[in-house]
Amino acid sequence: MKVVFFHRKQADGNFSIEALFQQVRNSLPDDIDPKMCEMLFYSRGFFRRLFCCLQAFFSQGEVNHVTGDIHFVTLFLRRNKTVLTIHDLGFMEGKSGLSYFILKWFWIVWPAKHCKVITVISEATKNELIRYVPGSASKIKVIYNPVSDLFRPLAKQFNKTRPVILQIGTKHNKNIDRLLQAVKGLPCVVYFLGKLERKQVQLLNQFSISYKEYINLSTEEVVELYRSCDVVSFVSTVEGFGLPIVEANAVGRAVVTSNISSMPEVAGGSAHLVDPFDVQSIRVGIQKILDDDAYREQLIKNGFENAKRFDIKQIADQYAGVYRKLSAQ
């Protein structure tokens, strides 16, 4: 069975979707022949997107899988043979007027109606999608993101004197301003995976917080960053999934994350949950992990069990089941 995976044209430093489905393709059963179709053009402007749609139309397989971001190409594929993955709907945040209309209809409503199966990466994303497309629940299947097998347990002596807090991501939803207010005055170092904005650097200097910035790392380098830290921070205001929670679980690091969106679902009792809009709540959570050795070790133990839910073989088998069902129709 030939399954064609349709990917956006990859931009520098933006490779999460591609890495995810490369893992899936590598782990699919032998009866599935996966092919990748990367768009020749970036998803920018009407004519480039139209060319992407035409490329998709002429590249179809027995089953088609639109893997995210370029949802609109679904409109040019055979409806009964197409799977659409929607990772999150955060791109709708703050939109209004014409941009809201275009995103709603060409990225959500019409693509959702013009495919046989929609896969989403969390129950939170499923519930949000249903609000935009009432009546779509029957075609939505939740398939979690897998954790790479590069993330393996590595014991580390916890640094009680000067712990390293690893913050994954620096975009607006990552809630950096409140995190910095929360760790102000704590004897720690903050590692940031992602490029810091000028305002964030100013706050770091204003609060006299020691930090290091890491950008454009390979997967292997990211793994080493997890291994080098003592605590992982992921107190986002919204997330479609939250893979860093599971990556930290798999390595064996305690996590503080948010009590909203998909994060409690992904954490599954393996992280300390905080209110991301409350600086004091974030500070208390971090302080609890730093100070309470028994609590921290229990979170780590829970994390190892939680990570088992995101094994790549299980995830690939779930996708394979979807492909077989569509192929048989």
Residue ranges and their predicted role:
Residues 98-118:
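Membrane-proximal helix-turn-helix segments that form the acceptor-binding/catalytic region
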Residues 235-237:
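Aromatic "clamp/platform" in nucleotide-sugar-dependent glycosyltransferases that forms part
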Residues 158-174, 180-184:
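Conserved donor-binding/catalytic core segment of Leloir-type glycosyltransferases
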Residues 245, 253-257:
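Short hydrophobic beta-strand element within catalytic cores of glycosyltransferases
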Residues 124, 146:
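Carbohydrate-associated surface elements
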Residues 194, 200-223:
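Nucleotide-activated donor-binding/catalytic signature segment of Leloir-type glycosyltransferases, i.e.
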